[in-house]
A protein has these predicted regions:
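Terminal leader/tail segments of proteins
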Residues: 1-115
Length: 115
């Protein structure tokens, strides 16, 4: 899937539509587990790199997660520009990374343990 190249101020409609985009140090992607179908997919919006997810939509549980950790001025602006304007569940950045990488199961299952 090709990412739309947009300006940061045009990010919100892409986020609300769950469309991948690339802006200036603000971008999104669909993440899914290898060898699984789209039921395990997550739509992740990042500021700068994968170490700072701002918002995550988890398809499996139909929930938006929001990074509740402290960040700088530019990342704060990225968050405002990409906010989906819907109910979100706030998480610490470490938990956001777990959800981005493993879905909500990353919050409840230790790494290496599968159901």
């Amino acid at each position: 899937m090709s990412k739309a190249k947009i300006s940061n101020c045009n990010a919100r409609p892409h986020v609300q539509s769950l469309k991948e985009f690339k802006a200036n140090n603000l971008w999104s992607e669909w993440v899914h587990d290898v060898n699984t179908d789209t039921k395990d997919a997550r739509y992740v919006v990042y500021s700068y790199d994968r170490h700072w997810p701002l918002f995550i939509y988890d398809v499996r549980c139909n929930v938006w997660f929001e990074n509740a950790s402290k960040y700088g001025v530019t990342t704060s602006k990225h968050k405002t520009q990409s906010n989906p304007h819907t109910d979100t569940t706030p998480l610490h950045v470490d938990d956001m990374i777990k959800v981005a990488n493993n879905g909500v199961t990353g919050l409840i299952a230790p790494l290496g343990v599968t159901a």
